[in-house]
Amino acid sequence: MKLIIATHNPGKVKELEGMLTPLGFEVESLLDYPDAPETDETGTTFEENAALKATEAAAYFGHAVLADDSGLEVDALDGAPGVYSARFAGPEKSDEANNALLLEKLNGETNRTARFVCALCLAKPSGETLTVRGTIEGTIGYSPQGENGFGYDPLFIVPSLHKTAAELERDEKAVVSHRGQALRKLEAEIIPFMKG
C-alpha cells in the first residue's frame, strides 16, 4: 500500500520510512514530487500544522498522506521553540544555527528539561483525518554530541539511555523517540482507517 509523507525533510523521511516499510507501506515523500506545493504552517499547535500539511497534500495528490509536525519544547524558554523549531534561528531552517541559538538562550540556565513532541496526521483525499501525538522527555546538553539524526538531536539527552538522540542507532531511536511513539499509536488504527 502506498503512503505519501508530506515533508521535504530528508531526516524525517528516513526515520518514518524505516518505521513504515516494515508495516508493508511503499513510502514516497514530497522529495519525490518537487512540484508539489508547500503548505504554510500557520497552526499554533503541532496537531494543527500536521493536519494542514496532510489535508492539503491529500487533496493535491488524491491519495492518503501522512504528515508530521514536530519540535522541541524547552521548559526554561516557556515551551519555545515549539512549533517554530525548524525556523528558530531564521527562515533558512539551519540545524546548526538553531542549535547554536538554543545553547545561547540556555547559557547559565540550570533548568534544561525539555521534550520532543510529534503530531502525526493521516489524511484521506475526502478530508477525513486521524491524528496522534507522541512525546519524549529529556534534557538539553551543553554541547552537540553524536552524528546520527537531525535537528536538535545532538543536544537532546535521553535520560534512560544517557545518550543524545544523535548518539542513538536507528533501531534504538525508533523505540524511544517521539516520532516512534506517535507511529506506534497510529499503527493500531492505520490499516482500518486506510480501508474505511
From Swiss-Prot:
Cofactor note: Binds 1 Mg(2+) ion per subunit.
EC number of this enzyme: 3.6.1.66
Functional summary from the UniProt entry: Pyrophosphatase that catalyzes the hydrolysis of nucleoside triphosphates to their monophosphate derivatives, with a high preference for the non-canonical purine nucleotides XTP (xanthosine triphosphate), dITP (deoxyinosine triphosphate) and ITP. Seems to function as a house-cleaning enzyme that removes non-canonical purine nucleotides from the nucleotide pool, thus preventing their incorporation into DNA/RNA and avoiding chromosomal lesions.
HAMAP family with a match to the protein in the record: Non_canon_purine_NTPase (MF_01405)
GO biological process, one term: nucleotide metabolic process
Catalysed reaction equations from the record: XTP + H2O = XMP + diphosphate + H(+); dITP + H2O = dIMP + diphosphate + H(+); ITP + H2O = IMP + diphosphate + H(+)
Record note on quaternary structure: Homodimer.
Catalytic-site annotation from UniProt: 69
Protein name: dITP/XTP pyrophosphatase
Residues noted as binding Mg(2+) in the record, renumbered to the chain: 40, 69
Signal peptide segment: none
Single GO cellular component term: cytosol
Pfam families to which the protein is assigned, alphabetical: Ham1p_like
Residues given in the record as substrate binding sites: 7-12, 70, 150-153, 173, 178-179
Keywords: Hydrolase, Magnesium, Metal-binding, Nucleotide metabolism, Nucleotide-binding
Organism domain of life: Bacteria
Name of the top EC class for this enzyme: hydrolase
Cofactors required: Mg(2+)
GO molecular function ontology, one term from the record: XTP diphosphatase activity
Family: Belongs to the HAM1 NTPase family.
